[in-house]
Each structure stands twice: as C-alpha cells, then as structure tokens.
Design a protein with these regions (language model features):
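Structural motif marking the loop-to-transmembrane transition
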Residues: 16-24, 83
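Bacterial N-terminal signal peptides
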Residues: 23-36
Length: 240
C-alpha cells in the first residue's frame, strides 16, 4: 500500500491555520502561475506530432512513444462520446499509470510533470494525474469552466491529496476523478475527502463545503514559472 503524494498543501482546519493558510496560498500561486502561462493549452488542449513522438522515443524509449500514441488515439476517438463517457475513459487511461513521489521520480520536492513526462516514465504523483486528466479533457472539447483541479484533505490517510472535479453545470454537484479510485463519484459521496482549494486556468476558489467554493481571485495577477509553458510547448513542437 502506498502513501498519498502529500503535495505541499496544509490542512486549513489545523490549529496553526494562519501559517498553514499562507503556505497553502503560496503553493497554489506557484502551481497556478505554472499552468496559466500555458494558457493556450487550456483553450486548445494537447498537440501531437511526429516530432513529439520522436522526442518521446529518444528520451524515454519505444514503450513511452506507444503510450503517447495511445493518448492521441484516445483524444481523437472521443468526438462522438458524451462528456460522462470522456470522463470515464480519461480517468481509466491515467489511473493505470504507476504512482510514485516527486522525490523518487524527479529528485525534487515538487515537480509538475507534463502529461508527456508522465507517460514517459509511466509514473506520476497525485498532482500529475489531476493535471494530465485536465489537459486531456480540454483536448476532447470539455470546457475549462467545467473542470477544477482540487486540493483536498484525505481523512483516511490524514494527508493532502489532489483530484480533478468536473461540474456538469455551474450549480451542479461536481464529480470527482481520483487516481486512487476507478469510480467517478459525486463529491457528496466522497466523505473521505475535505476540499480546501480548487482552480482552473482562470480562477481560484476557497472551499466552503464539499460541494461549493467561494471565488477568491482570478489568474491574471499571477506571473511566475514561464518555464512550464516553454517546456510543454517544446515537447509538443509548437512554435512560440
């Protein structure tokens, strides 16, 4: 049995809430700025090319190349699927990837791997699963406003965790895509998870309860980690 990835997100219900809240906001600011500099990715999704596949094979080997081919086929075959069908396929695709920590994979405390790096090493931590599912669903035509990458507290493990939430409509109860579960369940049925923050490419929310969040900011004020965008674009062989 493995431990959750325990991203550097504190539990805001702790007695040290002021310190932990500041730490949580710093973590989210870093991650959000990383993702937001790749803003076109949120709008257009992942790009596949022969150059990308060749790079994957050189960097990670032929098996990794084939995994990216399978991801491309997954995206391209999704046109006729309902959104629940897309969720099921994407959740199953990435949940078969092995779990490991950032320290073990990248020798770093916090490393935000691209979907291609995830498939390259065939391993991920919880942030990587959630982000990879997010990008893939965007590629399939799911609107960004329906998706939120969500930091939660896992009560079973007493650790921080990350999942992807899908909102069928603005006021609907979200569905939770979790690397620890094959089932996609309504948030109200996940009593083992306490949401803390959620975000997408545009906004940031503070959790009010398991089903609702209060918007606490937008993303255009964030301006760090341009390297993530450059890395992702380079991997996809997209001209800057």
């Amino acid at each position: 049995m493995y431990s959750l990835c325990a991203p550097t997100l504190p539990y805001v219900l702790s007695p040290r809430s002021n310190f932990l809240l500041a730490s949580a906001l710093a973590t989210l600011t870093t991650l959000l700025s990383t993702l937001l500099f790749a803003g076109w990715v949120f709008a257009k999704g992942l790009a596949f090319s022969d150059a990308l596949l060749d790079w994957m094979e050189r960097e990670y080997g032929s098996d990794a190349r084939q995994r990216v081919v399978e991801l491309q086929r997954l995206v391209e075959s999704s046109a006729g699927l309902s959104e629940p069908g897309k969720l099921q396929r994407v959740n199953a695709f990435f949940n078969r990837v092995n779990y490991d920590s950032d320290y073990a994979l990248w020798d770093q405390k916090d490393y935000w791997a691209t979907p291609f790096e995830v498939l390259g090493v065939n391993s991920a931590d919880c942030e990587d699963y959630a982000i990879s599912k997010y990008f893939t669903l965007i590629s399939m035509g799911v609107e960004e406003e329906r998706l939120r990458i969500t930091y939660v507290k896992s009560l079973k493990r007493d650790e921080a965790h990350m999942v992807l939430a899908y909102y069928p409509s603005a006021e609907a109860e979200p569905l939770i895509l979790d690397n620890l579960s094959r089932k996609i369940q309504p948030a109200g049925e996940r009593n083992d998870l306490v949401p803390v923050y959620s975000f997408n490419g545009a906004d940031l929310w503070l959790a009010v309860n398991r089903l609702e969040g209060k918007k606490v900011g937008d993303s255009d004020r964030l301006s760090r980690w341009q390297a993530y965008q450059a890395k992702l674009m380079q991997q996809m062989a997209v001209d800057l």
